[in-house]
Every structure is written in structure tokens, then in C-alpha cells.
């Protein structure tokens, strides 16, 4: 990245900004004493798996770096000037925007993302409905798209199982933002051509919320590119933020979260203390048909299931173990990247008060966390499309876990195929109602009638 490009982008190149004097180091801690001493400095762990004997990357300010030196822990500086690194990343985004790439070949700011999602909804109104989940701490909308095919005989939209896909609980994880938006858009774009997509959209209602933390996401488009939490301030007005993915009520306050507001995993003053988690909680409580969920993060190449708060296995562990293999296999088939899989606690780290544990433990929803590809939280724009395409395949398999058999012949949805259903279909057929178009050829004709007779005689599966 040349100096001229940085200057043209209007970016700080002389060390100005919140990360001036900050570095990223790689170290390996070999004892619990060393790990506790390092953790006591309240650093920002950039490696998602800070385990003994394994290399980890840590973001340190100048004072923390001096403290690490005094501790005598060996380390290697991998980024000597984090502010310059952040500026260079911003310049890459600016340069990509100046080119002629597609929407998903670059990161998009909140306004661009919202305009794109609105365009997806406007372009397919029969299939896509905008959804307002709620409002953030600073009053921004938490919005999403509900994607489901129009009503079909024996399979109306209001009876279909639901799946919830969300991204960007952590503000700096922009790849998750783009991948979830891509998933929503391409459920629509691939509906006609891809039979697996068509089957999922026909048999489920899929709600995609690309940005759960809109305040934090907007904040990362300013000077603090690596901000993680929401925008909660303390009583004196100092910004400290709450880690939304430690603010959920199931086993809130336990291992893998912090009561220190300066910590990156600060859990808040109470479970559901934050309007962002409250809004998602209330949406889920209002939608009892939710059967599958995925919370998308970066980075680490992982497919993870409950639990986060304990090493004990959940009651449905055999189901999750099998599903994790299917999901990881679908991801691997796209670009060849193999994702680790398993429970959160043992695959990544202990984490209590997380979304996935609440969705599964409190609501019985089959729930996953993805940690996508990429080098840290700010991979270059060239990593976006590979992440989007492989994540699409994995998320589609998450949705497919929610699907149930459909009995088209059961027109009144009472679980029994009888003469009443035949009369209902006959009325629809005579009226030329689109629900009677069983072969999807945009015409109600005798072929549809014969198809219904065959389904009627076969009964429900």
C-alpha cells in the first residue's frame, strides 16, 4: 500500500489515532501462572483459542507491552504499528471501492449494507419481507430479512419451521457481516437454479440479521476499527462497552466472561442488560416455530455447537456431532477449507452467557456458532468472497436441520388426509387459485388435478 493511496483515502499515516503505539505480538504461554499473569493485563486476545502451549496473538498498548517484557514471557512482535496496520486496511477498502468490483468483493458500511438489503427485499416482495428486530442502545435499527416462498397447499408460510441466522454481535468482525448478507441475498438469487436452496426456502422461514450490534459496527467505520463490544458507557460517561455474546441469560456470569468493564468479554451488569440482546430475545420468544439458529463470527475456521459454559456434553450431543460433520463437509466442498468442529467449550474456549447456549438451553433451538475464515478480525477484501461462498453452504445445512416433511394433500393441516381435503382442493382448482398450481408452471390445469389425486391417494408420509 503506497503512501499516495493512503493520503488519497484521507487516512492517518503518521501514527495518529486510537492504536498509536500499539502492537500485536505472538507468544506461547506454558504454565497457568504465565497465562494468568498475561490475562491480568486485560489484553485483547486476537487468537480465539488462548491455550497453554499453543501460539496466541495479543493486541497490546505500550504499557501492556512493557509489562509483558517485565513478566519475562518470550514473544515476537508481528505487527509493529497497529495504527498503521489499521490505516492500511482502510486504504485497501477505499481502493477497492474505487474499482469496479461486485458488492461482495469489498466491505460495506452500514448505509451501503442497509441499501443492499432493502434492494433485495424490493426485488422479491413475494419471497422477502423486511423484519425489524428492535433498536440498539443508540437507537439504530436492528433489521433483517425474512425469506420464505409464498404459501403452498399443505405448506403455508405461517406453519413452516423457522431458522435464524445472525452476524456481527462483535462489531469488528466484518467478514461475518458480509457473509450473512450474502446468504440472505443468494437464497433469493439461487432459488430458481439450486434445488437445495429452493427446497429450504419452500419449507422454512429463514430470518437473516446481518448486524446484531449496529452501534458497534458503525463505530468500527471510524477510528476504532478493532472495537468489539456495544457502545455502553458507565455512569461517568466513559465508553467501555458490553460483549453482547456474554450477555445472554443462560449460565450468565460464569467461566469465560468478565465482570471488569475494561475486559473484552465484559458481560454487563446483568443478563440481558443490553437492548440489543433484549431485542433478539423478544423476537425469539415471539416466534416459537424457531428450530435452528447460527451465530456467525470471525475468525478461526470452526463449526461449534453447545455448550460454551461447560465441558459437559448436551443431551443432543449425538445429533450435534453428526450435524457438525455434515455442515463442515458442505463448507469444505466449496473451497477445500477444513473447519474444526465440536462443542464451544472444548473447540474454542470456555464462554458463558453466549447466544448459542441460551437459544438451545432455554428455548430448545438447535443452535451453532460459526467462526469463519480469515487472518484475524480484519482480513483483506480478497478473503470476503471465499468466506461468503463457503459460509453459504454451511448455513444452508443449518437451515436444513429444521426442515420437516410436507404433506401437500393435507389441505386443512389437521394431520389427516380425508375427503374434506379433497373438497378444499377442488374448490381451489375450480377457482383457479394459485395454491392449486402443484407443478409450479404458473397455470392451474388438469395436470395439477391429477397430481393432487396421486398425493391424496398416497396420504401423508
Region roles according to the model:
Residues 411-433, 440-461:
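Alpha-helical segments with a strong preference for the paired helices of cellulosomal dockerin domains
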Residues 6-407:
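M14 metallocarboxypeptidase catalytic domain recognition
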